[in-house]
């Protein structure tokens, strides 16, 4: 049976429903006699002083990642993405409680908190490894920006609506030059997010692959490409861009790039471990979240 000795709690700061669910989690962990720590900004949102005082410690994200053997993220998919980027380097597993809208990554619903947490604490869960992307921007051979992403790295025009010109290279080989609104480089995790909206394929989370999705390309033959998860992708910004392009990781970590800059994207060495309830099923998740069709005939 898996034993989690120290459990970290992180919540969406601007979501009162998330705060309420964290308070429920604290009471549940207290009843089970479990040590828990609170992320410092999360603790500041809890009005019941007795609950924050019950925490073993209140600490920042890095310290939390170093001492916890399980971190519960309460919020939407964005909250889990933020937690993943901050904690992947510490190899601490994450479990999501959904207080957002879609909930592709946050499995446990609010009404299931006590039941599903009891199962997890007794070892009844499924574990899954997901990879992140490392992104760096080089200018004249010098690294000027670094970031990582669980979902996607996006090259785009920022606030201006202009075509971008750039080249795509994979593993040192020139692939194509492109004029488009931008490019999405996505993990399997991100393939059900922005990449999907851009016409990219859905990749099963266990696939070791990266998908490259053009955004409104000027050439109709420019289609999404799936490459090996071990590939190094290089984007080179062209000369004839009327606006300074931007690079975004999971919707955050903006970096402004200019002519001649190189954007290098590769798999992050550290994998993220996600925990799921035992009844988790990726295809069921797609059906329920994306509105896929059910059985034509009810199973007997």
UniProtKB/Swiss-Prot annotation:
> Molecular function (GO) terms listed?
ATP binding; metal ion binding; NAD binding; NAD+ kinase activity
Cellular component GO terms, alphabetical: cytoplasm
Q: Which residues form the active site?
A: 77
Which compartments does it reside in?
Answer: Cytoplasm
The record, for Gene3D superfamilies, names:
Probable inorganic polyphosphate/atp-NAD kinase, domain 1 (3.40.50.10330), Probable inorganic polyphosphate/atp-NAD kinase, domain 2 (2.60.200.30)
Q: Which InterPro entries match?
A: ATP-NAD_kinase_N, ATP-NAD_kinase_PpnK-typ_C, NAD/diacylglycerol_kinase_sf, NADK
Q: Name one GO biological process term.
A: NADP biosynthetic process
* Origin: domain of life: Bacteria
Give the Enzyme Commission number: 2.7.1.23
Q: Does this entry carry the keyword tRNA processing? A: no
Known cofactor(s): a divalent metal cation
Statement: the UniProt record of this protein carries the keyword Ion transport: no
Instruction: For this UniProt record, give its keywords in alphabetical order, as a comma-separated list.
Output: ATP-binding, Cytoplasm, Kinase, NAD, NADP, Nucleotide-binding, Transferase
Chain positions recorded as NAD(+) binding sites: 77-78, 151-152, 162, 179, 181, 192-197
Which reaction is this enzyme known to catalyze? NAD(+) + ATP = ADP + NADP(+) + H(+)
Which SUPFAM superfamilies does this one have? Answer: NAD kinase/diacylglycerol kinase-like (SSF111331)
What HAMAP family does the entry give?
NAD_kinase
Q: What does this protein do?
A: Involved in the regulation of the intracellular balance of NAD and NADP, and is a key enzyme in the biosynthesis of NADP. Catalyzes specifically the phosphorylation on 2'-hydroxyl of the adenosine moiety of NAD to yield NADP.
Query: What PANTHER family does this protein's entry cite?
Result: NAD KINASE (PTHR20275:SF0)
Family the UniProt entry places it in: Belongs to the NAD kinase family.
Protein name, entry field: NAD kinase
User: What is the organism lineage in this UniProt record?
Assistant: Bacteria, Pseudomonadati, Pseudomonadota, Gammaproteobacteria, Cellvibrionales
Query: Coding gene?
Result: nadK
